[in-house]
Amino acid sequence: MSDTPNTPAQSHTSPILEVKNLKTYFPVKRGLLRKHVGNVKAVDDVSFSVGQQETLGLVGESGCGKSTVGRTILRLIPHTSGSVTFQDQDVFAASSSEMKAYRRQMQMIFQDPVGSLNPRMTIRRIIGEPMQVHRIATGSELDDRIATLLTKCGMLPEHMYRYPHEFSGGQRQRIGIARALALNPKFIVCDEPVSALDVSVQSQILNLLQDLQEEFGLSYLFIAHNLAVVEHFCDRIAVMYLGRIVELADRETLYRNPIHPYTKALLSAAPNPTPRGKKQRIMLLGDVPSPISFFKDEEKLAAEITAGTVNEMTEEERAEAAAELDTSVATITRKSLLDRPPLVPVENEPGHFVSKHV
């Protein structure tokens, strides 16, 4: 795409982060000599921006590339092409020493509150280590800062002397949030921070993130697959499918007027506790297409790998059968979503972009 959706002129706030035409491919290698036969297009030409103190939601089913986007932005994994600009500076062009400074401004809250905390380290060391590496605090000042961070995240100061296994999942995620705040960042990637938690705990963590955003002026890239959470937490929402953003709009517009077939299917599958009327269910038929792109001379190999995946019924037959069983159910075949044109603005809806299917 040539233009970044929701550019500064179209946004209510100036962007702190701008992603343009980002691609992250992983090589596919086969055979004894590990010949490079193709690529997994995990992220394929993604563009968006995040404003100051804004929360941008990134939603989609598992495997669509959401987490890869977040990790690529933070340079935790290498990118293939494209650019990421943070506070008007090119992140991918930064040297190792410059990247160390960026680390103070960009942090991540991980999905797994158990696996993201070293079980052999005390909470004091987990939260304090980043501050020691960046020489922010030492000695008694370090302990004071750790105690303050724990308190702000709903923990007790004395918890710093315990180990991760002594806490519940929700408490461990609070510790992960405190660690992310240790360096006073401006931008945080929240990689499904509540998906592994009980529903009763999810609201507490979300309220905490909102309070911290107001207090510290944070900007979030909020990665999730729970549309109910995204609806109440995010300012704008980008919908991903097979490595690309297929629709982007502010929260109210997206839920009021979804345009892309995949967005409609996602929203129709989400439970609604306060339905205003009968909602039509939209079903996605067929297997999820492979994100692997084989080179032309490997088409035969691709056919061998994908052999045996044909369903007993064709997608058209399944659609007809579903329609006969339930007239309130609409169907969309995944094959029809493979053609993904660039994002274009929606007429009379500023800030609403869709990969338009005709």
Tell what function each PLM region has.
Residues 8-15, 28-34, 39, 251-358:
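Short catalytic/signature loops enriched in Gly
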Residues 61, 189, 193, 197, ...:
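P-loop NTP-binding/switch modules centered on Walker-like glycine-rich loops
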Residues 82-90:
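Conserved ABC transporter NBD signature motif
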Residues 89-90, 141-158, 267:
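Conserved ABC ATPase "signature" region
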Residues 163-167, 171:
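Conserved ABC ATPase signature
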